[in-house]
Amino acid sequence: TRSITIAVESGSDRVRQIVNKKLTNDEIVQAAIHAKAGGLSSLKLYGMAGIPGEEMEDLEQTAIMMKTIKKAVPGLRLTLGCSTFVPKAHTPFQWFGVNRQAEKRLQFLQKQLRSQGIDFRPESYNWSVIQALLSRGDRRLSHLLEKTCHYGDSLGSYRRAFKELKGQLPPLEYYVHENWSPTQTLPWSHLHGPLPLTTLIKHSAAATNLFNQPMAEFSLATLD
């Protein structure tokens, strides 16, 4: 089976502007049409839930985009893989934590899409929490990693190790969900990334300015 994968991030124009993804829904639909015309039998798209600044209306736009593609290209097998946003070092979103509503948002997309015959493949929210813990963790996590290595690579091992180290580590909330100040010294501040800190702060501020921009200023479709 021949297929292509497109990283759309979201079906919302507003969210794509926040992450500086230069794609429109029309371009995505046209790509699907061309894929079918070119002999491909399936199309895979990749998105995220819980991107900083995302609202439920943005998730609705993702569902609408997928339904629009299905209607425009009947017979093309559609898959949407979706992960939870996890902050990464040396990126404009390194100061943002994991959205506490991300799991519910994945469930919303699943309900909207699977009933339409669209294959929805969410990544594990619980493992995304562990990813965020490791992504934003500092030297204090060394003992946790030793314990999980001993107990085995499972969610239960991380929970057990974190419980045993209670009082020796900041709460999970701090590492995973809290938004950090741009003036805060980060665990990786001593390392030089591809972009200087001033550039990351500038890009982060530009994205943040879009958070409260009214949805009406963007092209919106209606969720039936």
What are these regions (language model features)?
Residues T1-A72, T91-K104:
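Conserved non-cysteine loop/helix-boundary elements of the Radical SAM core domain that shape
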Residues S3-A7, S42-Y46, T79-C82, R121, ...:
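Structured core elements
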Residues D13-V19, G47-E57, V73-R100, Q116-S142, ...:
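Flexible glycine/acidic-rich beta-alpha junction loops that bind and position SAM and/or redox cofactors
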Residues A35-G38, L76-T84, P170-N179:
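Short, compositionally biased low-complexity segments
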Residues I69-V73, L113, T208:
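A generic secondary-structure signal for well-formed alpha-helical elements
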Residues R100-Q116, T148:
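C-terminal helicase module of SF1/SF2 nucleic-acid helicases/translocases
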Residues S115-D224:
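Radical SAM enzyme core and accessory elements
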